[in-house]
């Protein structure tokens, strides 16, 4: 009897899932590679960042892919401005991730009228 009562609930939950927009992760490829801490010091510092953006819905994914050159430009500028301190520990990297998300959302707001990107993930971040 309990099973019979749960079946309609499970069916309704499945229908809701089918109608809901799907989350997508868009990998910005190729990875970002460049120099940072360009303060005139004797040592050349290099970063490599594999970045993915989380969006919900096909339209959001298409918009991000359409504006990928602008997004990449903004992120390259941000990464290049970093100092040794801002790339050297976990807390600093988390702050960089949040700032990168904010800047990507600003690009999308300017181009599409809404932030669209829900999260930015570093799949890999290497600094030397």
Task: Give the residues covered by each predicted segment.
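Flexible, low-complexity charged segments
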Residues: 1-128
């Amino acid at each position: 009897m309990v099973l019979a009562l749960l079946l309609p609930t499970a069916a309704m939950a499945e229908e809701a899932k089918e109608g809901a927009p799907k989350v997508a992760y868009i990998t910005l490829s190729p990875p970002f590679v460049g120099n940072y801490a360009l303060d005139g010091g004797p040592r050349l510092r290099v970063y490599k960042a594999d970045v993915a953006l989380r969006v919900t819905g096909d339209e959001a994914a298409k918009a991000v892919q359409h504006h990928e050159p602008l997004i990449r430009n903004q992120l390259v500028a941000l990464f290049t401005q970093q100092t040794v301190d801002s790339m050297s520990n976990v807390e600093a990297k988390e702050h960089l991730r949040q700032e990168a998300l904010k800047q990507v959302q600003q690009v999308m707001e300017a181009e599409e009228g809404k932030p669209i990107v829900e999260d930015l993930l570093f799949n890999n971040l290497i600094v030397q």
